[in-house]
């Protein structure tokens, strides 16, 4: 049975932002009579997330991602709408809510800057009232999985960015939360650190069933972790679907290059080597040399697996590659279509 952990229904949030023109005269005028703009950060946000899901919550800068996370964390109170997480309203039952919530902000630290990382973990244990045996189990497991053993005695300010982010994730999980919000968790990290963080989050979801909401501009994070994508733009949900659906809709055409022994007949001659190209695919180029062939196909609606299976029935494939649109280009195409 699928359990609904998060429910947002018609959430709206508007901020009043002061404004003034540049110059000393306008600055003095601003002291007497301030002017304000009303910025609608969240226009009408509705979605649900099931227990154990990993969801990529994406959108351009200023789309409303962080405001949504703050509402779900209990930091912001919306102007209207309903938000229920694990049976609680975050801003009304904040103490109970945060006891089951872990949050990692890539550009803000949840650790104490001047004390060793291990001391920060001890303080968090007291804040969340984590039993000693559970704390020890969690710390040992997080230390091993995130390779923190050599960092526990080091003050936070002396850590590299990659080291600090691994410690931030451990700090967010020290109390065994059911729900984890990751806001730009790999910002500024090198390739090795990014892979380590992605691997850990994936394993955490698989082993513990932790629900993960990921907001990021790094589409490699989304591709590696999230099966479902929610796109927000100008304070509204524009798309909610699977990553595979997103690819199918915005990827455009892919090309499959196949190398094989012998030749294939793509013409009208009837024979054992006559190859009928599956619907949704077309031949772009064919080269034959020294008893081997190289064919390039363009794929529209035809799945790669269908074309490969059809080729394998006729020839022995020696090499194959698929060139598709990168996840970053797909998301850019999506932004363009929605005008955000």
Q: Whereabouts are the PLM-identified features?
A:
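ABC transporter nucleotide-binding domain
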Residues: 198-298
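Conserved catalytic motifs of ABC-family nucleotide-binding domains
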Residues: 176
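Conserved ABC ATPase signature
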Residues: 155-159
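Catalytic Walker B motif of ABC-type/P-loop ATPase nucleotide-binding domains
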Residues: 180-184
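Conserved ABC ATPase "signature" region
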Residues: 23-31, 122, 126, 134-151
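Conserved ABC transporter NBD signature motif
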Residues: 81-92, 97-98
């Amino acid at each position: 049975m699928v359990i609904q952990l998060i429910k947002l229904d018609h959430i709206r949030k508007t901020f009043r932002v002061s404004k003034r023109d540049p110059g000393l005269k306008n600055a003095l005028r601003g002291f007497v009579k301030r002017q304000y703009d009303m910025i609608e950060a969240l226009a009408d946000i509705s979605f649900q997330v099931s227990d154990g899901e990993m969801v990529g919550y994406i959108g351009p800068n200023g789309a409303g991602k962080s405001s949504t996370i703050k509402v779900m964390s209990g930091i912001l109170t919306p102007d209207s709408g309903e938000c229920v997480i694990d049976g609680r309203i975050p801003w009304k039952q904040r103490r109970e809510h945060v006891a089951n919530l872990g949050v990692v902000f890539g550009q803000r630290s949840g650790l104490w800057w001047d004390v060793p990382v291990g001391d920060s973990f001890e303080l968090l244990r007291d804040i969340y009232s984590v039993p000693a045996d559970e704390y020890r189990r969690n710390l040992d497991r997080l230390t091993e999985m995130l390779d923190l053993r050599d960092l526990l005695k080091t003050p936070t300010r002396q850590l590299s960015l990659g080291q600090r982010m691994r410690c931030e994730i451990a700090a967010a999980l020290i109390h065994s939360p059911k729900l984890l919000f990751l806001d730009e968790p790999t910002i500024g990290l090198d390739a090795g650190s990014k892979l380590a963080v992605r691997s850990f989050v994936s394993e955490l979801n698989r082993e513990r069933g932790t629900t993960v909401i990921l907001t990021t501009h790094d589409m490699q994070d989304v591709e590696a972790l999230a099966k479902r994508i929610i796109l927000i733009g100008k304070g509204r949900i524009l798309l909610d679907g699977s990553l595979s659906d997103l690819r199918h809709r915005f990827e455009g055409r892919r090309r499959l290059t196949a190398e094989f022994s012998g030749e294939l007949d793509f013409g009208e001659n009837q024979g054992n080597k006559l190859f009928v190209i599956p619907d949704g695919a077309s031949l772009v180029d064919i080269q034959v040399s020294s008893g081997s062939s190289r064919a390039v196909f363009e794929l529209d609606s035809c799945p790669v697996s269908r074309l490969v299976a059809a080729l394998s029935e006729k020839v022995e494939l020696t090499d194959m590659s698929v060139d598709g649109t990168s996840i970053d280009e797909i998301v850019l195409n999506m932004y363009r279509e929605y005008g955000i």
